[in-house]
């Protein structure tokens, strides 16, 4: 290597280092200091370090490049998503096996029984809304990766055990399969159902409630209004960190039409509320399928049941924890509803729950309800839809 070439190489390398260093400082440009951040308490340095790590340009570059290689070469995303056909994405919770699944299912079924008994003691009827997995409803869009054997018959097993435990659980799978001819019941890039899918489920539940005559009182009319349709980036795209360098590789966004539901006589009810404390006859408990207003499941349920519904669903905590919190709430203890709709995605049955925030003795009492002597081995019963 000649002297000139060595100098050129050294200067080029030095220029590259300076350029990369200058580029990397861009991560600090958007940092904003608050009054609580000082050099003395160390909060300023810690906050700057955290912000810089999150906004580090080279880190974003590496993340984007690595994700693009996984996506294009191996048709894979980050843990959390499974890639299907025709830009369909699925939650890996509907695919992966679970260690100790049999024991977890037995424990969760025991809790479901205990919930049913607690509600009955307060004069409330449980309606268990088992939501079929998106991967079960849209098997035609599955790719090379298939759900573990644990999930093969999970929906039917869940329903069989509910019947054996005398838990009222209307079927939602058949109505959803039939509704696919009219439109999507699950979002292509998201874990959740569409507003149409939520409406189909609500109508099926309402028909079952009506057949059993579970609601008393005068019906209340509701109306649902459709809003604008806009592109919607589903939650499963968060496991494909291709943005911003390779955003063109991302699946196209879904189209989501906003729906809102209101009482037909909303103004009259508002006036009546000044003079009367009206007890709401139905409670809804569940997951983000119920809590997120994007899907309008609450509104669809109100319109289908022709009844006001109080929503106690929570986002990000699964179906069991919100129900246990509801059973301990003053709202339930002081004014138990006639019907409690418990939205429960099937994939949560074999999942472990962190119940450390609840009294262990109370949890044990729920698990050892009056039906605890029944054998609920999931392998004992098989049914069809």
UniProtKB/Swiss-Prot annotation:
Pathway(s): Glycan biosynthesis; alginate biosynthesis
EC code: 2.3.1.-
List UniProt keywords, sorted A-Z: Acyltransferase, Alginate biosynthesis, Cell inner membrane, Cell membrane, Membrane, Periplasm, Signal, Transferase
Membrane topology type? Peripheral membrane protein
> Among the record's GO biological process terms, what is one?
alginic acid biosynthetic process
GO MF term set: acyltransferase activity
Q: Where in the cell is it found?
A: Cell inner membrane; Periplasm
The record's listing under InterPro entries reads: AlgJ, ALGX/ALGJ_SGNH-like
Q: Which GO terms describe its cellular component?
A: periplasmic space; plasma membrane
Active site (catalytic residues): 190, 192, 288
Which SUPFAM superfamilies does this UniProt record tie to the protein? SGNH hydrolase (SSF52266)
What does UniProt give as the signal peptide span? 1-21
Q: Which family does it belong to?
A: Belongs to the AlgJ family.
This protein's name? Probable alginate O-acetylase AlgJ
* Organism (species): Pseudomonas putida (strain ATCC 47054 / DSM 6125 / CFBP 8728 / NCIMB 11950 / KT2440)
